[in-house]
């Protein structure tokens, strides 16, 4: 098996405090994405990200993955925002299958919850 999906970086963030002190959801998504890239211990991983998956939340952003990718230099990645209610495991399974098939090299998966 040439293409084997492996988890190479994790980002996690929890904010507490008054509403005025908390970051917008878009900034939180950016922070955890960058933290996961840094956690991989190879910033070059962003050059392999072919897809960015973000499950839809209760925010008004049209395509937060595109904004993150363009801001951080991996703008060729295909982005998707999935519908509310889609099982998160299905997204992970789909990404793994695409990697196994050689359709993509790496995926960034960002999920927020309140």
Regions found by a protein language model. Give the residues of each.
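Conserved small/polar residues in nucleotide/adenosyl-binding loops
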Residues: 110-114
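Conserved catalytic cysteine-centered active-site region
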Residues: 56-106
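Active-site pocket-shaping loop/turn-to-helix segments
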Residues: 12-34, 56, 78-93
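Extreme N-terminal starter segment of soluble prokaryotic enzymes
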Residues: 2-6
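Short glycine-rich phosphate-binding loop at a beta-alpha junction
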Residues: 49-55
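Phosphate/pyrophosphate-binding loops at sites that engage ATP/ADP/AMP, CoA/4′-phosphopantetheine
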Residues: 37-49
């Amino acid at each position: 098996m040439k293409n084997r999906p492996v988890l190479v970086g994790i980002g996690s963030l929890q904010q507490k405090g008054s509403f005025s002190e908390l970051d917008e959801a878009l900034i939180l998504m950016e922070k955890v994405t960058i933290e996961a890239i840094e956690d991989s211990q190879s910033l070059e991983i962003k050059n392999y990200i072919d897809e960015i998956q973000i499950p839809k939340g209760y925010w008004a952003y049209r395509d937060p993955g595109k904004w993150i990718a363009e801001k951080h230099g991996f703008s060729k990645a295909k982005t998707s925002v999935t519908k509310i209610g889609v099982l998160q495991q299905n997204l992970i399974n789909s990404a793994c299958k695409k990697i196994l098939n050689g359709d993509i090299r790496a995926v960034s998966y960002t999920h927020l919850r309140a």
